[in-house]
Amino acid sequence: MTVTAPVSGLLDVDRVAADFPILSRTGRGGNRLVYLDSGATSQKPTAVLDAERGFYTQHNAAVHRGAHLLAEEATDAYEHARQRIADLVGAQPRELVFTKNATEAINLVSYSFSNATAKAQHGRALPDGAERFVLRPGDEIVVTEMEHHANLVPWQEVADKTGAVLRWIGVTEEGRLDLDHPEHGLSVINERTRVVALTHQSNVLGTVTPVGLVAEAAHAVGALVVLDACQSVPHMPVDVEALGADYVAFSGHKML
């Protein structure tokens, strides 16, 4: 009889898979299900499923909307989660805004530019600090060629509505940002740039971008930096303060 023992230091795939009930089912042809689309959404382990069921069967209520027992418990859980997430990414709890997903989060930021611009064009008063969100014809928005549509289409829409110009940072044959390119490199960030939107880690290539370098160039000309961190936060330590981005979006449903 042959006995195979796991090699020390290697991941025990079967043990990990056992935590995910959906992986116990079979796929086409009766073969064991293999899931490789965690970049879109990750499957949920038993601990997460149990926690969600526990909330809905024991604590479900609208948060910050009541003083009864369930409302207090739900609100406490909600704010505890906010603190845990802030600790995870090196942020302050007051800086976190919960949205349905990262697409909505990025759209929320892009709408800030569209709305502030529309108000300014109609001569309406702007809230304190909103002037930096006003875009004028000839202002520029910089994106990269490796962006997910969620961090591209919103900026195309903003450019179309405001008259701003969309500029691109290119990608090398190796799948990295081509920051040294004379026309499509870091030099596209200039005194007309108002916002720079980029991914931290490509959902297609896995490339990790030099966010700090790009953010430094953007801030030097007064531009805001919007970072898509959906693929990086689940897979590596992320400190949003150290990265230097002004807005960072990531998704809870992709965390495993």
What are these regions (language model features)?
Residues 1-256:
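Pyridoxal 5′-phosphate
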